[in-house]
């Protein structure tokens, strides 16, 4: 998956399920729940050992950068997932108090007339050590996908199906013919545990979305995501007629 598709994968299957207010049930009647439980932090192997996910509002060029969140908490880079192990949630001061868990500075409001709630900010996958050429060269049979076209995920942010605009066959370590309408599906934990290669800094792109919605009344904010290209093994892929 190329970075412009990875940002959706991060957003939907890491970002939303790790929001602590959602885990505590606050979004149940609007946007759903989370397959993650409060007791999972510090023990759940969320992905393979190649998965390192950081919350970092201090990066100037990303969409959701700040020095303090809207509760006045200083913002720092924090690992949410290190070597695949789930460490901490996306939870601000109030959710931390309610749960007893250590979170991050992510209480954000879209305006003066909305309360701060737990939101993503800059949520990134840390680069690995392989170039795009090395990753492609290590794949016997697969497909390169880029540019999101469609998305569907259940209200616990667990089972998902995503489609891409661009697909290109990989055979014996080489890019081959183009396919159309490639899709893939999976279950969040299983999917991230099948992460088998992470691109280096040369594949890393800073992207994001300006319109992530959450809360009642609704709040729309900017969210930053940065990611290298990533390889996943044993994924259910369908569509993609040549």
Predicted region positions:
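N-terminal small-residue-enriched
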Residues: 1-242
């Amino acid at each position: 998956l190329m970075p412009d598709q990875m940002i959706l994968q991060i957003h939907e299957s890491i970002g939303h399920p790790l929001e602590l207010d959602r885990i505590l049930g606050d979004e149940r009647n609007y946007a759903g729940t989370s397959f993650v439980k409060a007791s999972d932090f510090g023990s759940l192997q969320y992905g393979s050992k190649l998965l390192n996910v950081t919350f970092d509002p201090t990066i100037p060029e990303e969409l959701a950068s700040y020095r303090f969140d809207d509760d006045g908490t200083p913002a720092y880079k924090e690992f949410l997932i290190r070597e695949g192990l789930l460490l901490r949630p996306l939870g601000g001061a109030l959710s931390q108090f309610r749960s007893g868990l250590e979170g991050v500075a992510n209480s954000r409001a879209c305006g003066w007339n909305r309360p701060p709630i737990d939101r993503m900010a800059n949520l990134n996958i840390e680069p690995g050590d392989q170039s795009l050429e090395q990753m492609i060269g290590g794949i016997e049979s697969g497909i390169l996908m880029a540019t999101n076209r469609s998305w569907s995920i259940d209200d616990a942010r667990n089972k998902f199906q995503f489609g891409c605009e661009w697909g290109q066959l990989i055979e014996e370590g080489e890019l081959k013919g183009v396919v159309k309408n490639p899709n893939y599906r999976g279950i969040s934990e299983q999917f991230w545990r099948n992460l088998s290669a992470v691109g280096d800094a040369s594949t890393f792109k800073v992207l994001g979305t300006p319109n992530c919605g959450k809360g009642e009344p609704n709040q729309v904010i900017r969210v930053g995501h940065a990611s290298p290209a990533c390889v996943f093994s044993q994924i259910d892929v369908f569509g993609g007629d040549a």
